[in-house]
């Protein structure tokens, strides 16, 4: 340890080991300078030049004949260089369409959709409205849900499921089809068959005084008729 400390102190006397932030210890500045000399300078107008090349615009220097005769006032008819090719409006539109590739697709999709609406798709499916058919299919389904497939009259009178599940009370046009209700004759209007109904639904029952029904189901002043 004494030997190492002695060498370190003797070397420190001849060289200052203090770290300097601004000193380039690795020589990076020399390396960067060499790379910058060998690298190709970038053109600041590279985007502009590529755009001109895409559009086919000529940015070449003028003809030397024009430069030589421009100051002398000579005629330009004797120029030896070929005249530049004329660019039409259609060519410019076609070249500018490269910059907006989605514009033509949108126009084509709008045109195709309008043509499909006019002439239809597939000939036989012309004017085929899928959503309209789906709505028409939903309406009967909803209507069928509202109409029970059982006889409410028989179920309310305590008939077994085999009986009230075998038929319905009425048809959609209001005709009574329940065999038990068809055999019943209304005591007020004597209606039966297709127009059969109970006293509760009889048109003449509005003129009769309402009977108070007890808990057992027997009306005051009357007897309960047990069908089942």
Curated annotation (Swiss-Prot):
A GO cellular-component term linked to this record: cytoplasm
Binding, Zn(2+) 2: 186, 189, 197, 202
Keyword RNA-binding: yes
Classification via PROSITE patterns: ZF_NANOS (PS51522)
Superkingdom, natural source: Eukaryota
Main location: cytoplasm
Localization per record: Cytoplasm, Perinuclear region; Cytoplasm
Motif (C2HC 2): 186-202
Listed name of the protein: Nanos homolog 1
UniProt source species: Danio rerio (Zebrafish)
Gene name of the encoded protein: nanos1
